[in-house]
Amino acid sequence: MESILSEERKCYICGSTRWLERHHIYGGANRPKSEKYGLVVYLCHWCHNEPPNGVHFNKERMRWLREEGQRAFQKRYPDLDFLAIFRHNYL
């Protein structure tokens, strides 16, 4: 599924259009759910996988992105219970 957070093919964090990678906001066991509900964004390689600021190395950025994901989910799917599906409240 396409992203419910952004229709643009650019880094969700910095806006770059170079070296983009698709990031599932909720990984691990929740990765298929991220895909199902459109909780994916494009990130440039530096904002995705490079220390110290890539989301996989920076807890604050990861937390912010998960908050953004939950807000987008609740707006798009008002009849679904985010907590019941993802087992965590990020807000």
Q: How would you name each of these model-derived features?
A:
Residues 1-21, 46:
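Short cysteine-rich loop/turn motifs with clustered Cys
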Residues 18-21, 39-43, 69:
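Amphipathic alpha-helical interface surfaces
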Residues 20-28, 44-51:
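Histidine-centered catalytic micro-motifs
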Residues 26-40:
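Short linker/helix segments within small regulatory modules
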Residues 40-64:
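Short Cys/His-centered divalent metal-binding micro-motifs
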Residues 67-91:
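Short flanking/linker segments adjacent to small metal-binding domains or redox-active Cys/His motifs
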